[in-house]
């Protein structure tokens, strides 16, 4: 049984949140007890600081809110909750939503079109998500909408817009850019060979550096076994930035499970 690190009379009601049940999802399965307590503490603070706004009739239960907060805080487990400053609301649709998109082509013509989005992360505004894809983010599959949008927020802290290079020491920027672009080219080569649907890494990663960072952040936390061996140099840079090693967590958890089986038998 966890001893949760907040007061029972907390006005936010966080002391009554179903944290243990919320932690019971595959993407969080390999966290140590210490990491679970730390993540839950961050998630409680997240819910105190941010407003989750359910749209179009969606109802968010305490369990839903707890799991959303845990996923938001997973990337900043070691960075700190202050890395999520800069927005105050999370807007949540029931399903992917339609937005009016405006973009400028290479010759300066402005185009408008309606597009379906899974999520959005405004630099000086809210994070927008949808509940269907949030639920899919509970798995350890390489897809995680919440981590993706959080990665954009972290990326944008380094300048006016997300660039694929988060806030790292200046001396590391050139190496980061080199390894990130090498990964993009590698992913594009695979797409050219087998097609987008058959590619082992989400093809969206090849579109631009910011999306590559966000997509690979999804794999970093939810499918490290696909990321680490394919891009070992970039993997080490992600470990250094996030101050976490999800692949090592899996290995340590596996060894612990093996030890437990030996004790049982």
From Swiss-Prot:
Family: Belongs to the MtfA family.
GO cellular component, as recorded: cytosol
Entry protein name: Mlc titration factor A
Cofactor (UniProt): Zn(2+)
Membrane-traversing stretches: none
Enzyme Commission number(s): 3.4.11.-
Source organism of the structure: Klebsiella pneumoniae (strain 342)
Compartmental location: Cytoplasm
Residues binding Zn(2+): 111, 148, 152, 211
Function: Involved in the modulation of the activity of the glucose-phosphotransferase system (glucose-PTS). Interacts with the transcriptional repressor Mlc, preventing its interaction with DNA and leading to the modulation of expression of genes regulated by Mlc, including ptsG, which encodes the PTS system glucose-specific EIICB component.
Entry GO MF terms: aminopeptidase activity; metallopeptidase activity; zinc ion binding
Record has Hydrolase as a keyword: yes
Organism superkingdom: Bacteria
Keyword Protease (UniProt): yes
Record key words, sorted: Aminopeptidase, Cytoplasm, Hydrolase, Metal-binding, Metalloprotease, Protease, Zinc
Leading EC class: hydrolase
């Amino acid at each position: 049984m966890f001893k949760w690190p907040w007061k029972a009379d907390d006005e936010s009601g966080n002391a009554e949140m179903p944290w243990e049940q919320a932690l019971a999802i595959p993407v969080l399965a390999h966290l140590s007890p210490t990491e679970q307590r730390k993540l839950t503490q961050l998630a409680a603070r997240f819910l105190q600081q941010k407003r989750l706004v359910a749209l179009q009739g969606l109802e968010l239960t305490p369990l839903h809110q707890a799991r959303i907060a845990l996923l938001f805080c997973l990337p900043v487990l070691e960075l700190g909750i202050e890395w999520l400053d800069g927005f105050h609301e999370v807007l949540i649709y029931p399903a992917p939503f339609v937005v009016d998109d405006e973009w400028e082509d290479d010759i300066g013509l402005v185009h408008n079109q309606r597009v379906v989005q899974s999520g959005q992360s405004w630099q000086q505004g809210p994070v927008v998500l949808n509940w269907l894809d949030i639920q899919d983010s509970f798995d350890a599959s390489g897809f995680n909408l919440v981590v993706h949008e959080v990665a954009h927020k972290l990326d944008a802290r380094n300048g006016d817009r997300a660039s694929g290079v988060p806030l790292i020491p200046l001396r590391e920027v050139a190496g980061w850019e080199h390894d990130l672009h090498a990964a993009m080219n590698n992913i594009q080569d695979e797409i050219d060979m087998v097609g987008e649907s058959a590619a082992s890494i989400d093809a969206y990663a090849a579109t631009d550096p910011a999306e590559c960072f966000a997509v690979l952040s999804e794999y970093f936390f939810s499918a490290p076994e696909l990321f680490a061996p394919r891009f070992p140099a970039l993997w080490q840079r992600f470990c250094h930035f996030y101050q976490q090693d999800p692949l090592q967590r899996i290995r340590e958890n596996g060894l612990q499970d093996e030890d437990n089986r030996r004790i049982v038998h």
